[in-house]
Design a protein with these regions (language model features):
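Basic, flexible Lys/Arg- and Gly-enriched helix-loop patches that mediate nucleic-acid binding at interfaces
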Residues: 1-240
Length: 240
């Protein structure tokens, strides 16, 4: 691996910043100052230091984002901002991608990573990874709707797997409900379509959980952070 790529991967700085840091003599390779960005290193064996601190290579990174509305869950889009536009320059150099998708008007928990194996496992239909959503609904959800979800909602093109519908609150004056929906699938507009089947309309949708991951309440919309060590260990253990 080239030294400059290694330094960028270790979040020392952007490619341009790293070259300047090398020129300034702030990087050593195996105890010697190194100024060549093109130097080929063995990230497992060579000792690379920045300002005296040993750097450890991270092959994979994992970010939790509170996706806002109006942003596309994609790596690129010709018309809209994407979730990658919300990351800083260093995070974008990790070549992460969103694990699954949230509709442009849906907000909440989104995992971004460059770990393709983890992403595949979480999205595999065989694993039935639960995802929980909080939905503001126009109309009054009933116990009958709870039972319909539990049986599996028959949509036009497929029948949903049994899902859990919890009625959090009902406001008969405003004709609206707040519900929590847990599904093991992730089909296009699935929660909205399931609610529509019951004769109601989702007006706001937020994802709260994905498998063992739970949205951090302290993350404002559009903010992101690295997964904690504990959260990552639990997530990896859940798909092992």
């Amino acid at each position: 691996m080239r030294l400059d790529k290694f330094l960028v991967a270790c979040a020392v700085g952007s490619r341009t910043e790293v070259k300047n840091l090398l020129k300034a003599g702030r990087v050593t390779a195996n105890g010697k100052k190194e100024k060549s960005a093109k130097l080929q290193i063995d990230e497992e064996r060579d000792e690379i230091r920045f300002d005296g601190q040993v750097l450890e290579y991270e092959e994979f990174v994992y970010y939790m984002m509170n996706k806002p509305q109006g942003v596309i869950s994609s790596t690129e889009d010709p018309k809209h901002r994407t979730v990658l536009d919300l990351l800083d320059d260093i995070a974008r150099t990790k070549e992460v991608f969103p694990v699954g998708r949230l509709d442009i008007d849906t907000h909440g928990l989104l995992l971004l990573t460059n770990d393709g194996q983890l992403a595949h496992a979480l999205l595999s239909p065989k694993r039935h990874v639960d995802k929980t959503y909080l939905a503001q609904v126009k109309g009054i959800m009933t116990q009958e709707d709870v039972e319909t979800f539990a049986k599996g909602v028959p949509l036009k093109d497929f029948t949903c797997q049994p899902a859990k519908l919890e009625i959090v609150s009902v406001d008969s004056v405003k004709n609206q409900s707040l519900v929590r929906v847990t599904i093991a699938e992730g089909k296009f507009h699935q929660v909205k379509r399931m609610v529509a089947y019951c004769g109601k309309e989702v007006v706001d949708l937020q994802r709260l959980t994905m498998g063992t991951l739970v949205l951090d309440e302290n993350l404002e919309r559009g903010e992101w952070r690295r997964l904690t060590k504990e959260a990552l260990e639990n997530l990896l253990a859940s798909i092992a």
